[in-house]
Amino acid sequence: MNKKQHIIEIATELFNQYGYHVVGVDLIIKEAGVSKKTMYRYFQSKANLIIEVLQQRQILCATSLKQKIQHEVDNFKKLELVFEWHDEWFNSTTFTGCLFAKAATEFPNKSEEAHQIAMQQKSSLMAVIEQLLPHTHKHLAPILIMLLDGATLSAQVLGDKKAAIKAWKTAQNLILK
């Protein structure tokens, strides 16, 4: 792994665990075992590093979700797999909440690039869900996103490891109604 990617991975872990504003460049440098010169060779600022972290995480999550659902032919089952993907994430040892939700919270100005990436991630996930819903139920996509967001918070804040499963049961009730 090259140094730039190593810095990104360390920063991702730190931002995920502590948030964006709390983690300083000095901590990233220390944990990554690199010099300030090396850090700034790859990233002009902490803001640039945050953007890179979010962009890579967006690609990673989208790719992982796509791989999870790609072999299933039934859209309803694919939708269930979206919730299953979240269940697996919530129950992983590295789960500490959503980097995109943290970005939207810590960078509340919608013109900030970190906030825009968070909005793009949410829009992309909504597009996936909308695509999987029957034409007559496309209006439910934002509601299913809310269920997933609520499940994410329940898993993070309350430690509810079954939050995604509960959200799927509610989603099923809405879709099959």
Enumerate the language-model features and the residues they cover.
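Helix-turn-helix
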Residues: H6, I10, L14-N48
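Short, solvent-exposed amphipathic helices
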Residues: Q67, E113-V128
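Hydrophobic/aromatic-rich alpha-helical bundle segments in the mid-to-C-terminal region
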Residues: A114-M119, H135-I175
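Hydrophobic alpha-helical connector segments
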Residues: E52, K66-S92, A141-L144
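Hydrophobic/aromatic residues within well-ordered alpha-helical segments
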Residues: K46, V53, R57-C61, N75, ...
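Amphipathic alpha-helical segments used for helix-helix packing
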Residues: F90-Q116
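Generic hydrophobic, amphipathic alpha-helix propensity
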Residues: K3-A11, I28, V53-R57, C61
